[in-house]
């Protein structure tokens, strides 16, 4: 059988890939959960390891011919352990949510109480949202941010924990721009006899390079995705203390998954190697510097930021003073060539399909090589679009400015 190229086999998919490449090349991507994977990561993910079934774990497979799959998984495990300084790693979860699921299924029973950050305050679906499996299987309690400061209300966290005695407390968020105090969460968890799980999906790259305090000394379990600030393939990882290793491993397989995606694990291993480099540390420094520069520039232009700024890779913009919705802002900015996402803000009165805010992140633009000067220009473009949201002429002018920046900073 002659192996044909994608272009020969499926012109439609080939064309869509080219169109997506054009979109990513010619627009400024500022969705905080997105990034550009390296060529090396994509080569590994597109490798012939996609052909291999490897149920089980290295040295304990249910299929023959796994000698190289074993080596790939061992490399990924050892690199992740080195990167995060943890005792045990499982690199098989297909996603961040499945990594979270592994912890829940290993340590909880249906009907147990979990406590996480409210989705509308910046949390994640898999931390107890009623539309997620967590909200259906477990009793859920939500903490949020202080209405005045925009910071996590640790007094509320302690009060709710003491009142409801959750079995597990989840820290981590999808739209929280400030440093998370893992030590304070740990103290509260110990007070009420709860496990502490840190979901670091958004800030894993920052933690790996010491740009954000690590949850490792304080947490029983740590979960993450491998994309976002880690800049790897889409996937998940569970890390834990050695005493929980067996429970986690048997929950991932055979508990909630079958065969691992060896090609994705290979790509994870590559991403971990990249993340161990000095270049990656410099990259993370620039991600934060760019975020702070952009946040300050937007504030000077009259934008209100939740918590009045950022400590990490993202900011949450409150658009209520401009009398437009997050949905309207997302659509207008995309026309100009800047891709963000509508996002609820704490105490939002609008539904999540509309929202009063937008979330903006700097990982992707920093990967392209943009710096503080470009953040000032991007702030200006955002201002012009938001203040002239119905003016097609202004939006076309801003589109030209976006194109100039994109040409100056190619991706691949």
Swiss-Prot record:
GO biological process, one term: tetrahydrofolate interconversion
PROSITE patterns tied to this protein: SHMT
Cellular compartment(s): Cytoplasm
Needed co-factor(s): pyridoxal 5'-phosphate
InterPro entries (alphabetical): PyrdxlP-dep_Trfase, PyrdxlP-dep_Trfase_major, PyrdxlP-dep_Trfase_small, Ser_HO-MeTrfase, Ser_HO-MeTrfase-like, Ser_HO-MeTrfase_PLP_BS, SHMT-like_dom
Gene3D superfamilies: Aspartate Aminotransferase, domain 1 (3.90.1150.10), Type I PLP-dependent aspartate aminotransferase-like (Major domain) (3.40.640.10)
Binding site for (6S)-5,6,7,8-tetrahydrofolate: 119, 123-125
GO molecular function: glycine hydroxymethyltransferase activity; pyridoxal phosphate binding
Residue numbers of N6-(pyridoxal phosphate)lysine PTMs: 228
Record-linked Pfam families: SHMT
Highest taxon above the source species: Bacteria
Site-annotated residues for Plays an important role in substrate specificity: 227
SUPFAM superfamilies in UniProt: PLP-dependent transferases (SSF53383)
E.C. no: 2.1.2.1
GO cellular component, one term: cytoplasm
Catalytic activity: (6R)-5,10-methylene-5,6,7,8-tetrahydrofolate + glycine + H2O = (6S)-5,6,7,8-tetrahydrofolate + L-serine
Pathway named in the protein's UniProt entry: One-carbon metabolism; tetrahydrofolate interconversion; Amino-acid biosynthesis; glycine biosynthesis; glycine from L-serine: step 1/1
Assembly: Homodimer.
Function: Catalyzes the reversible interconversion of serine and glycine with tetrahydrofolate (THF) serving as the one-carbon carrier. This reaction serves as the major source of one-carbon groups required for the biosynthesis of purines, thymidylate, methionine, and other important biomolecules. Also exhibits THF-independent aldolase activity toward beta-hydroxyamino acids, producing glycine and aldehydes, via a retro-aldol mechanism.
Family membership: Belongs to the SHMT family.
Name of the protein in question: Serine hydroxymethyltransferase
UniProt organism field: Thermodesulfovibrio yellowstonii (strain ATCC 51303 / DSM 11347 / YP87)
Lineage per the UniProt record: Bacteria, Pseudomonadati, Nitrospirota, Thermodesulfovibrionia, Thermodesulfovibrionales
Gene for this chain: glyA
